[in-house]
């Protein structure tokens, strides 16, 4: 069954969890698609994961177009979500539309952009012109130099700001709201408040769905493992088994567990 925006909203309304994994090539796209992962995120995480750079900032539009095309060739049913790259959408809604249109022409079905309520005008501009949007709030990696590192967002008084971001962006027409590294109670409140389905990474188990970087889920990560990561390969013994275990754990609401949550 072809996954669409309507499919995602129906799953969320029925309380059935949505699964998302990053994907950068045709072979893994085919494997994840056949396993039943609903969303393949062609993320700018390809910078650190595939290119070996230390952040997502150097990733270019050309990089994204190449990897989206690769994934689109391998996926038959999954919805392909493409990241908008740093510097290619922040200047104006018009700049964002030109960038997003190229991502869709390459094979994406939806684009993801980072930022809070101030991105509402751009979100609305894209949606009104036929481009589905996933809003990325909380820890937004393209803002790493502003945050001074990769840190949990939304604690204390900052929680109200992130809740407002989610409300404003959903009202602007975002089809999905992705929350990264926010406290689980805040993510739960946002999920219960906004109409758009929510996807969490380091945001507790009460979101509409979950996402992990594929390589993290398979135990392929240099250095220290992030708190929200679980290595599904350890027990599964095969890539296909690990993917199936991830899907089952998300659907059964056993992942993320307490130890993966802020």
From Swiss-Prot:
What does the cofactor section's free text say about binding?
Binds 1 Mg(2+) ion per subunit.
Which parts form a coiled-coil structure per UniProt?
Answer: none
Residues that, per the record, bind 3-methyl-2-oxobutanoate:
44-45, 83, 112
Q: Which GO terms describe its cellular component?
A: cytoplasm
- MF GO annotations: 3-methyl-2-oxobutanoate hydroxymethyltransferase activity; magnesium ion binding
Active-site residues are: 180
Could you tell me the superkingdom of the organism this chain comes from? Bacteria
* Transmembrane regions listed in the UniProt entry: none
Under the heading Pfam families, the entry gives: Pantoate_transf (PF02548)
Keyword annotations for this protein, in alphabetical order, are:
Cytoplasm, Magnesium, Metal-binding, Pantothenate biosynthesis, Transferase
The yes or no answer to whether the keyword Glycoprotein is present is: no
Functionally, this protein is described as follows:
Catalyzes the reversible reaction in which hydroxymethyl group from 5,10-methylenetetrahydrofolate is transferred onto alpha-ketoisovalerate to form ketopantoate.
Q: Which family does it belong to?
A: Belongs to the PanB family.
Oligomer status and interactors: Homodecamer; pentamer of dimers.
User: Which NCBIfam families does the UniProt record give?
Assistant: panB, PRK00311.1
Please report the name of this protein according to its UniProt entry: 3-methyl-2-oxobutanoate hydroxymethyltransferase
């Amino acid at each position: 069954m072809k996954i669409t925006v309507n499919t995602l909203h129906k799953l969320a309304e029925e309380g059935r969890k949505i699964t998302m994994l990053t994907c950068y090539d045709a072979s893994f796209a085919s494997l994840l698609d056949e396993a039943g992962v609903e969303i393949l995120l062609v993320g700018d995480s390809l910078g650190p994961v595939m290119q070996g750079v230390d952040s997502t900032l150097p990733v270019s539009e050309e990089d994204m177009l190449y990897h989206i095309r690769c994934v689109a060739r391998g996926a038959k049913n999954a919805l392909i979500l493409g990241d908008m790259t740093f510097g290619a959408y922040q200047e104006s809604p018009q700049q964002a539309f030109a960038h997003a249109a190229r991502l869709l022409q390459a094979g994406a079905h939806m684009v993801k952009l980072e930022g809070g309520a101030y991105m509402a005008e751009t979100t609305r501009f894209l949606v009104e012109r036929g481009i589905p949007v996933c809003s990325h709030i909380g820890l937004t990696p393209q803002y790493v130099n502003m945050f001074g590192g990769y840190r949990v967002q939304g604690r204390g008084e900052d929680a109200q700001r992130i809740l407002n971001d989610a409300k404003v962006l959903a009202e602007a027409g975002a089809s999905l709201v992705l929350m990264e590294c926010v406290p689980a109670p805040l993510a739960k409140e946002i999920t219960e408040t906004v109409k758009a389905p929510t996807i969490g990474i380091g945001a507790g188990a009460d979101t509409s769905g979950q996402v992990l970087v594929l390589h993290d889920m398979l135990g392929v990560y240099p250095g220290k493992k992030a708190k929200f990561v679980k290595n599904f390969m350890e027990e599964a013994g095969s890539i296909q088994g690990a993917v199936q275990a991830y899907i089952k754990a998300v659907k059964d609401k056993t992942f993320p567990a307490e130890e993966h949550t802020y």
